[in-house]
Amino acid sequence: MSITVVKRDGTREPYDANRINLAIEDATQGLDENIGWVTQIASELEITLFDGITTQQLDEAVIQVALQNVKDDPAFDTVAARLLLKTIYKRVLGDYSSPEELKRLHAEHFARNIQRGVDEMLLDSRLVQLFDLERLAQALEPAHDELLKYIGVVTLNNRYGIKGRNGDALEVPQYFWMRIAMGLTLNEQDPTSTAIAFYEKMSKLEYLAAGSTLVNAGTIYPQLANCFVMEMQDDIEHIAKTTRDVMWLTKGTGGIGLSVSKLRAQGSPIRSNNTTSTGPIPFMHTIDSVLRAVSRGGKKFGALCFYMENWHLDFPEFLDLRQNSGDPYRRTRTANTAVWISDEFMKRVQNDEDWYLFDPLEVSDLNELYGKAFSERYAFYVGEAEAGRIRMFKRIKAREQFKSILISLQTTSHPWLTWKDTINNRALNNNTGTIHLSNLCTEITLPQDEDNVSVCNLASINLSQHFADGKIDFAKIEQSARLAVRQLDNLIDITRSSVKEADFSNQQNRAVGLGVMGFTDVVEKLGFSYESEESYDLIDEIMEHVSYAAIDESADLAQERGAYPNFAGSRWSEGLVPLDSIALMEADRGVPVKVNRTTRLDWDALRTKVKGGMRNATLMAIAPTASIGLVAGTTPGLDPQFSQIFSRSTSSGKFLEVNRNLVKDLQELGIWETVRENILRSQGDIQGIAAIPDHVKATYRTSFQLSPYAFLEVAARAQKWIDQAISRNMYLETRDLGDMMDIYFAGWERGVKTTYYLHMKPRHTAEQSTVKVDKSQDADGTKRKGFGGFGGGAPAVAPASAPASTATADAPAPQAAPAPRKGFGFGGVGGAR
């Protein structure tokens, strides 16, 4: 049967197999098996063809054939990415026959596409007015697209790329990177040169701006900030205003943290009309509905996290917000929840004491206090309650509430646990008020009040692109950190929101959050285990260099552009740096913080320098990087590998993920072809496959196979250098509440500020319908049980009696695993069954 292909203009032409084969051959250039793969893809493609197939369907069919072979060799992903890139090039630039012609087309069309974006009122007219477009066009390098994986190309094109008013794509990837660079240099004296410098870094995936910046930079709606943190006040006008603000910030793609701790409890009196309050829950449900009504950038639902202090009288209902059962009008289906926990509560859990819940109307100052001041005032209110001088309160056991929090965490992954006293005591910008909450992803820690909606602007260094010749390039990391801080500082003067309190706070504090991603990627390339001392020292050293360079650059920018307005009176002005905050927290808490204090760089010189001024109130925060990590083609944030082979579902579709580092190591050992089917059969788990050496198994333990104390130790080592916080996902195999209590207590003891999602290992797995397996074969190996140490080996961190490695390590290093506390008596008690 003859097959005809329908072209874009509606005409038909005979299917040309040779033309398709040449396209496939071009996409396999430089790959080891390119000749065999051309034949394989072409033969598998023939099965999918039909008469009348469109050119778009044909392009998609070739890509899908390549993708279905990724499980056999991750290099097929490169083939798929190249094929997709070619379709994007053709639609935006037209046909081409060589890399040289492609580069020429990039340069020829660039100014024309920028002008079209301006004419269609999509792009800022200053992109034409302020820049030497010809010079920028000559700087474009389409070869950088080779760094993108297939999922990165799809994510960049579908989620972040600019579309014309008629829906057609305006940007190829290199136009996208240059548009971002231009949009972040509008305030530079030499915008063209600086844009090229930013472009070089981002197009090489060395660092990436966060999502809102990628969507809106260079456009007529420059809402570039990523995180907004606000507090709802206890009056009807401010509740209504907060709802309005959430709508506008959501429209602009911002993620939101919102504290409801000040709202009076259900049943609390309202004097203006002689009735009683419904409490915060109905207002939270209303805002939850707003998140669905106003999409972020027209692409997905709004995103928000509610925060509540756990002394609030309505906290038990807050715990139920994410439950599937119950009154739907007292549930939040879209918004997340997090609990704001004090040291006082943790100590009462530890000592098995009572915990009192109050109506904020009667204890209105508690919300503004932290540390010792909070504990003293809380004890005063406890006495008042017992004396009958407080109208509404409830007494429970602290351990029972902690148990309830963890059970809710098991069943719904909410509320996330965040520690308010750790956050406030470690803040270097503490002169501008109390920090009442974190943000959507728990990495931002900024003060806020009725007149200030805190704003943070994010970027992340891709560690994978700072690894070469078997080692980390620390000089390159420092260079990236400096340029990223300058870029983020520019962003603050360019971004605009529709909330005046946010714009005011942004200018007064100039907060930025530079983080990292790809940590697990480089750990694997180095052959380390995630739960090893080498891994802990690595993140320690990386973050020390990032921190030093970022702080030093901000001090330089202060000399060039002036210090941020609220600098005077901050701990920066006293010459303190993030490392110094550990001692401040320790002094307030009254117990040692179990974190290593090793240093490598000349911090005394930097302490002296920061006294002279800082351009930014904050500089560092490690975001989850779930989306930009896909573009960067690396592991997100500090997270371990979820699995060696798994299907990832995103807003752009489903994608098969195969760990290229593992495949490369197994290919070098000559056993990939032998063990491939066993890995597929075990759903990416290599621990029970006898043919794989133990050292490889140690390197490639996945999230549920690692000790959760390793996640905490990595976070604690990174946190000592970070002035804000870390989105620290947790992965647990156990459902034992005793284990869970011990784990989260260990996080608090190590000075970790926040945790993020809790992922529980599924009890059951689905049958693999696409994998042929011999079920008579039993994989060797035994499953590790319990949490007695890191991977069942010797403790990875020196015991408390061991000397610190430097003179600055004046506190004992943490033990690899906690004392056998077993959850204060909850050991063996299951949560959600």
Pin down the residues of each PLM region:
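Extended catalytic cores of very large enzyme megasubunits
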Residues: 1-833
